[in-house]
Each structure stands twice: as structure tokens, then as C-alpha cells.
Regions:
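Extracellular ligand-binding/catalytic regions of CAZymes and related secreted enzymes
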Residues: 39-42, 49, 57-60, 64-73, ...
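N-terminal export signals
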Residues: 20-37
Length: 266
């Protein structure tokens, strides 16, 4: 009888210990930080580099650098393509943002164009670099998306670039200005009211009397953000020269822009 009683005590103690352990687990769950969630998978970025006009020699390098930036970030991954069939409603659902380094009138069908606009309008991201504004001059909706058109590049030199808002998280690390050597775009048809300019050319650093300079006042914008529906749009006119793509500052701007456009910060 005593042996039975001892066995019962051992079992009872085991049950109590198990209950205490479960309670401890419950307590740990209760104090989990608010908003904690399993690690999110990387955001997928579709990098589209079709050239219907001039093709930039730097495009292969840009693919390598963007792919590496994504891998290093752990937050996004880049798929590069020149295949317009990627622009179907179903396929775009796989991506968080689309980035253009393009020229000319791209061979996209009306359905593909609608799919792109609806994709961004629904809350996804769109990013354009350099000649993305030298694209789709005959499609007015594209101008509404990107915010301006390329209007010549009279300067190919080292210039001073002003940081319009040094407090903006996308460019705060740059300070008040930076010096860059690149092909410098002029922008026409710029939607100044609907855009937030981040970087602008300091006109005192160039010859405004040079042939091809247009004295339209758009504030010499070079990099900006805007919204299209619920979607976030980023554009930078920089990115012609390999040295720009290899510049840590430019890489950080693009990384920040991708994070912003996909709502992963900054």
C-alpha cells in the first residue's frame, strides 16, 4: 500500500511540474512584444530593362549591383527581365515593386499597361532610374505615374547636387549636398505639386548658357517621390555612369527607395 502511495506522489509531482511549465510558456507568450510576427520573406522586385531607344551600357552592371544589394539587405530580391509578358495581372501579384531602366515606346499591350497601372495604384511600388523618364512619350498615363519627362542632357560632368530636405529618411545620410559626375538630365512636364523633390541640381555648378539648356523653371529636380493611387513612386535621373552605380551613396539611395516603396522602411 505504501508503494502505491509513493507512486501516486511521483505522478502527482510530475503533473504539477508539467502544469507549471505550461503556465511558464503561456507567460512567455503573453510578454511577446506587441506586433511580433514570424520573419517576413524578402520582397520581390521586378527590374525591367527593355530598351526601345538608346540602350545604356551600364545596364548589365546595374543588374549585378541591384541583385547584390537585395541579397545583402535580406529584405528584397531582384528579378531582372526584358520580357514584357511579365506584365500580366497574375504575374505582377508575385512582386512588391517594379523598377524601370528603359527607353522609348516599350512594346507593351494595352492590357499590360493597365496591369502595371493597377499594380501600382493598388499599393505596390514603382521605381524609375535615369532613362525611365525617356520612356512612353505617347502614353499620357505613364507621365501621371512617373511625374516628368526627359528633356535633354546638356551636361555630362561633375556637378553639385542639393539635398532639398536633409531630414528625409531616404537621403538624410547625404547631408546638405553632394558632388557627382554623371549625365545630367533636364526634366519637362514635371508635376511639381504632386511630387516631393529629394535632390536637385545646383544650377550654379553648370553653364546655363550651354547649347541645349532649357530655362524652364521646374527647380532642376533630379530625384523625387510621389504617389500613384495607393502606390509609392520613386525616380532618380542619376545612373548613366558605371561610377555612379558603384558609388556607395547611390546604392544606399536605391536601397532606401526600394524599402520605402515596399513599405519596409525607411
Amino acid at each position: 500500500m505504501l508503494g502505491f502511495f509513493n507512486t501516486w506522489l511521483v505522478l502527482a509531482e510530475a503533473i504539477v511540474r508539467r502544469r507549471d511549465f505550461i503556465a511558464l510558456l503561456g507567460g512567455a507568450a503573453a510578454i511577446r512584444p506587441l506586433g511580433a510576427h514570424p520573419e517576413r520573406p524578402p520582397e520581390r522586385i521586378l527590374y525591367f530593362t527593355y530598351s526601345a531607344g538608346y540602350r545604356h551600357d551600364v545596364i548589365p552592371l546595374s543588374k549585378v549591383i541591384l541583385t547584390r544589394l537585395g541579397s545583402n539587405s535580406g529584405v528584397f530580391e531582384v528579378t531582372a527581365t526584358e520580357d514584357t509578358s511579365e506584365f500580366s495581372t497574375e504575374n505582377l501579384e508575385r512582386y512588391a515593386a517594379v523598377m524601370f531602366y528603359t527607353t522609348g515606346e516599350l512594346p507593351m499591350s494595352d492590357a499590360q499597361k493597365r496591369a502595371l497601372l493597377n499594380f501600382v495604384r493598388s499599393g505596390r511600388g514603382f521605381l524609375g532610374v535615369h532613362s525611365a523618364t525617356d520612356t512612353f512619350y505617347t502614353w499620357p498615363d505613364y507621365l501621371d505615374l512617373v511625374g516628368g519627362y526627359f528633356n535633354g542632357h546638356p551636361w555630362h560632368q561633375s556637378v553639385k547636387i542639393e539635398v532639398v530636405d536633409p531630414g528625409d529618411p531616404l537621403v538624410a545620410f547625404l547631408g546638405n549636398s553632394l558632388q557627382v559626375e554623371d549625365e545630367i538630365y533636364q526634366i519637362s512636364d514635371f508635376d511639381y505639386r504632386g511630387s516631393r523633390v529629394l535632390l536637385r541640381l545646383d544650377p550654379s555648378s553648370v553653364d546655363l548658357g550651354k547649347t541645349g539648356v532649357h530655362q524652364r523653371f521646374y527647380g532642376w529636380p533630379l530625384t523625387w517621390t510621389r504617389y500613384y493611387g495607393e502606390g509609392r513612386v520613386f525616380y532618380s535621373a542619376l545612373g548613366h555612369e558605371p561610377s555612379v552605380w558603384q558609388d556607395d551613396r547611390y546604392q544606399r539611395i536605391l536601397t532606401n527607395a526600394i524599402l520605402w516603396s515596399t513599405r519596409r522602411s525607411p
